[in-house]
Regions:
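Short, Φ-rich (hydrophobic/aromatic) sequence segments
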Residues: 75-77, 110-111, 193, 241
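Short helix/loop segments within enzyme catalytic domains
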Residues: 52-79, 119-123
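Soluble non-cytosolic domains of exported or imported proteins
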Residues: 10-15, 19, 36-40, 97-101, ...
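Acidic/His-rich structured neighborhood in mature extracellular/periplasmic domains
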Residues: 1-63
Length: 270
């Protein structure tokens, strides 16, 4: 795992104690979520509690970078915190290098702010450790009580503004999705997106029917100014095919994930 390898490569031996505490705190936490806000607090809280435990500042690359770029990071996080696109924030050491894992930094700062603004420090620690990450409202209440953001957060507007920038699938070619008379001689399938896409990331999976219904043999690459993905396919006559395009990795060049979590491509040959 390159991400994990990079994490340890950037740690000194002095940080091993902190890492052990960080991982132990994870065993005491409740729930999980694929939303940037929830997962960032979940990770950052482990760093903050570890720092309280060892009674000295922890030193990591993301904390150092984060503190030196606080304003711009906070603004970007606010735009993306209600999304499920981790690309700019978590587990991205193999792509982002020095500005990787900044969700840890933001989560740490949110927890630190919550703690500093709490009159009862013991209760604050309990709140941080026992926060239920499956409960979006509880996580949002925690954020608001932390006073990490000075201004009021308009969740509806943030989500609306983010979704305006998300790419979507316009169509597939050379036949329409769910067609039932596709020529089995076809060797290419094209997916057309609404925006120029990041060509480094793909997330295509089997449908519930599994491997036998999966027609793709290879990802050929992008064309049409990176708005069209070309897939090589191998088809047989009178057979159903289907697969799922997900937003786990597909994103625009601006870093916005696909608006649909899953898009099923389904068709049948003649």
């Amino acid at each position: 795992n390159n991400w994990l390898k990079n994490v340890f490569a950037k740690q000194s031996l002095d940080n091993i104690v902190y890492l052990n505490i960080h991982e132990y705190i994870h065993t005491q936490q409740n729930g999980g979520n694929n939303r940037v806000l929830n997962q960032s607090i979940k990770e950052g809280s482990c760093d903050f509690i570890a720092e309280l435990t060892i009674e000295k500042p922890i030193i990591t690359q993301y904390l150092t970078y984060g503190k030196n770029h606080e304003k711009e990071i906070k603004e970007l996080f606010k735009k993306e915190m209600f999304s499920n696109n981790f690309t700019n924030w978590l587990y991205n050491g193999s792509q982002k290098e020095e500005n990787a894992d900044l969700g840890y930094y933001v989560g740490y700062e949110i927890c630190k702010s919550y703690y500093n603004n709490s009159a009862d420090k013991s209760q604050a620690i309990k709140d941080i450790i026992e926060l239920n990450y499956n409960d979006d409202k509880a996580v949002e209440d925690f954020l608001y009580k932390s006073k990490y953001f000075n201004e009021k957060i308009n969740k509806r507007k943030i989500i609306k503004d983010y979704s305006k920038n998300q790419p979507y699938i316009v169509k597939i070619e050379p036949f329409k999705n769910k067609s039932k008379n596709v020529k089995p001689e076809l060797k290419e399938l094209k997916i057309n997106f609404s925006k120029e896409m990041n060509t480094q990331y793909f997330s295509i999976s089997y449908s519930e029917k599994g491997k036998d219904y999966f027609p793709i043999t290879k990802v050929k690459g992008y064309e049409n100014n990176d708005k069209t993905l070309v897939l090589l396919i191998d088809l047989k006559p009178n057979k159903e095919y289907e697969f799922i395009i997900t937003n786990k990795s597909f994103m625009s060049k601006e870093g916005y994930s696909l608006i649909s979590e899953e898009y099923q491509v389904k068709f049948k040959t003649k």
